[in-house]
């Protein structure tokens, strides 16, 4: 997720607050609401199937999950959409007030570091939005100079060195550091990783398959957990299907089902559910 915040920052354009709210709402919040509801329905089915009759788990728990974590069970990976929306709005407001990008990075990272040091995990978006703003600002600042050979060389060397000497990485959603990792090195590792990945993909041939996934990433992102959720409901063990086959089905389904449904939606009046406008 580090890369997605970083990459989004490269495309930042200053806009009026109202335009930013409406545009971000259509592209991010609408898919979040629609596919969170579908995930909620899937989770309700699983709760009923397990015999859970506690109404709290159906009504209050999702609200608590949303308020504290930014998403709900059934499709909880969608936290990124709400966090990115907040990142875009906050960064836009800061730039309207001419706040320096480097200052935004320092303050935002400091907030995330403090959250880590004092184990402040709730609400989760306090840390991940702060980190997201830092990455978004870095993407904006480095959108052109990251492709300088010297900068790429330093970033690549640091990325490999940290990976080999002291592997450190952060779960961006929860701001959790891996065991025996170093938080500062994890930040450096992630930032250098973003620069490295961008440079690699800039110089390799464009592959139609990867290009398609990149252009339709929202389709795959909002649907893949629903696809996996439906697959896990099926009684594979009763059918005596090997786990390796089930895994293969999951992989194929996650690539084909979102693409198929996304195509149908994009060419219908319902393209808005994916944050797209009908062509």
Residue ranges and their predicted role:
Residues 1-279:
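Alpha-helical transmembrane segments and their immediate juxtamembrane cytosolic regions
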